[in-house]
């Protein structure tokens, strides 16, 4: 029970990686507040995880500061504190790659959720954590935070920004005993990512098609990256096992971002 007695707030916790994080945290003894805009899914996940007093759901649009403030205050009042803040909510945005065709409003929407939402989560978690002189803030970035060409421009720019925010806030909050890190996974099969499979690679079995495409481009063969694997990395950064780790972008990509896939020296 690596999180016995801890309290965590997980944004975007109603589905995908966020749901896996919430489930794993519960398994390790934490109390969880799932924050999302998907009310029905969020309530269902909360109940599947045992409901009150182990898990609860709170409606929150992470782009609205009052929503984030209320979600943080609700969690702290219900459970007495917040030990772990997981900024997981995010979107990929339109599949448009050609910058000449990119919609500026869509670009701003991606930044609003993926960057501003993370900033607000950090800001309001800090309100609770600073007086206690401890806490862990973990945000979800992406392999697109360290390379280009793996996603649309807005998504890539936003995930780079998450890494910058993580380092900047870690530099400030270290004096208060608060650790701030982020996790950058390679392609993971979720409801958010699977529609971005190239049409030429789609199969009748959507999951099989996605995994086939991802495996063909992966550096590390013979293993698939799944939502629970990302949750395990977040768990590590949330626990005392990483007590001296802060400002880290933990890249979980099987070496994809460090390999030059065009030269094929090792073929």
Swiss-Prot record:
Keyword NAD assigned: yes
Superkingdom per UniProt: Eukaryota
UniProt tissue specificity: Expressed in leaves, stems and rhizomes.
UniProt-listed Pfam families: adh_short_C2
Keywords: NAD, Oxidoreductase
Gene3D superfamilies: NAD(P)-binding Rossmann-like Domain
Substrates-to-products reaction catalysed: 10-hydroxy-alpha-humulene + NAD(+) = zerumbone + NADH + H(+)
Top-rank EC class of the record's enzyme: oxidoreductase
GO BP, one annotated term: abscisic acid biosynthetic process
One cellular-component annotation, GO: cytosol
Binding residues for NAD(+): 9-33
SUPFAM superfamilies assigned: NAD(P)-binding Rossmann-fold domains (SSF51735)
Signal peptide extent: none
EC numbers on record: 1.1.1.326
Entry annotation: catalytic residues: 155 (proton acceptor)
Ligand binding (substrate): 142
GO MF terms held by the record: xanthoxin dehydrogenase (NAD+) activity; zerumbone synthase activity
UniProt xrefs under PANTHER family: SHORT-CHAIN DEHYDROGENASE REDUCTASE, SHORT-CHAIN DEHYDROGENASE_REDUCTASE FAMILY PROTEIN
Membership in a protein family: Belongs to the short-chain dehydrogenases/reductases (SDR) family.
Reported function: Catalyzes 8-hydroxy-alpha-humulene into zerumbone in presence of NAD. Also converts borneol to camphor in vitro. Zerumbone is a highly promising multi-anticancer agent.
Protein name as it appears in the record: Zerumbone synthase
Provenance organism: Zingiber zerumbet
């Amino acid at each position: 029970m690596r999180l016995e007695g801890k309290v965590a707030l997980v944004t975007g916790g109603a589905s995908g990686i966020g749901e896996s994080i919430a489930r794993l945290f519960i398994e390790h003894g934490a109390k969880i507040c799932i924050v999302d805009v998907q009310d029905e899914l969020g309530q269902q996940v909360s109940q599947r995880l045992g409901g009150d007093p182990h898990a609860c759901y709170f409606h929150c649009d992470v782009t609205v500061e009052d929503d984030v403030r209320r979600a943080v205050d609700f969690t702290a009042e219900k459970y007495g504190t917040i030990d772990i803040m997981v900024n997981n909510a995010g979107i990929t945005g339109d599949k448009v790659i050609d910058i000449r065709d990119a919609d500026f409003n869509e670009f701003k929407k991606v930044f609003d959720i993926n960057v501003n939402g993370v900033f607000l989560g950090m800001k309001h978690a800090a309100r609770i954590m600073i007086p206690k002189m401890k806490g862990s803030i973990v945000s979800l970035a992406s392999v697109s935070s360290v390379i280009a060409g793996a996603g649309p421009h807005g998504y890539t720019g936003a995930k780079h920004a998450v890494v910058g925010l993580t380092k900047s806030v870690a530099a400030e909050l270290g004096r208060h005993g608060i650790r701030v890190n982020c996790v950058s996974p390679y392609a993971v099969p979720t409801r958010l990512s699977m529609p971005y499979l190239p049409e030429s690679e789609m199969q009748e079995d959507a999951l099989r098609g996605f995994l086939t495409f991802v495996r063909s481009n992966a550096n590390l063969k013979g293993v698939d990256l799944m939502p629970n694997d990302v949750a395990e990395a977040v768990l590590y950064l949330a626990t005392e096992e990483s007590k001296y780790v802060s400002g880290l972008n933990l890249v979980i990509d099987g070496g994809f971002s460090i390999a030059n896939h065009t030269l094929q020296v090792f073929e």
